[in-house]
Amino acid sequence: MAMTLQCDIVSAEREIFSGLVEMVVATGALGDLGVAYGHAPLLTSINPGPVRVIKQGGTEEIFYVSGGYLEVQPYHVTVLADTALRANDMDEAAALEAQERAQHQLAEQASEIDFQRAAVQLAEAAAQLRTLQAIKKKAGK
């Protein structure tokens, strides 16, 4: 039996996941970060995108986070995010629409503040689409 650690994925609204896992993979500023049982303590920011959780027995579940923090202790990992969703609960059409809207706003460039807001919205929509692609790849579609 593989060694496990406790994983909690929490958004500003609620706890999305809590359970024993074999590994958690998230995207940090310097690339993907895999956390397994006994990992050295760590606190790092994470980028918007997928967080993969490999549960006991090897089953995988994918979540979308809008960015946030990853806290690692040797036997516990916590993902703190402003927004966190199960990838299965995401709407691809809404993510594509948000991406198109942000691209349109970037093209207009009404003001510096609007440009920055549109750039953030575009990055979040792209991260949502990456998460949806990851779950489709996992399902073999």
Curated annotation (Swiss-Prot):
Belongs to the ATPase epsilon chain family. This is ATP synthase epsilon chain. F-type ATPases have 2 components, CF(1) - the catalytic core - and CF(0) - the membrane proton channel. CF(1) has five subunits: alpha(3), beta(3), gamma(1), delta(1), epsilon(1). CF(0) has three main subunits: a, b and c. Transmembrane segments: none annotated. GO terms for molecular function: ATP binding; proton-transporting ATP synthase activity, rotational mechanism. PANTHER family: ATP SYNTHASE DELTA/EPSILON CHAIN (PTHR13822), ATP SYNTHASE EPSILON CHAIN, CHLOROPLASTIC (PTHR13822:SF10). It comes from Cellvibrio japonicus (strain Ueda107). It is found in: Cell inner membrane. The gene is atpC. The keyword Translocase does not apply. CDD domains: F1-ATPase_delta. Keywords: ATP synthesis, Cell inner membrane, Cell membrane, CF(1), Hydrogen ion transport, Ion transport, Membrane, Transport. Its main location: membrane. Produces ATP from ADP in the presence of a proton gradient across the membrane. It holds the Pfam family ATP-synt_DE_N. Gene3D superfamilies: ATP synthase delta/epsilon subunit, C-terminal domain, F0F1 ATP synthase delta/epsilon subunit, N-terminal.
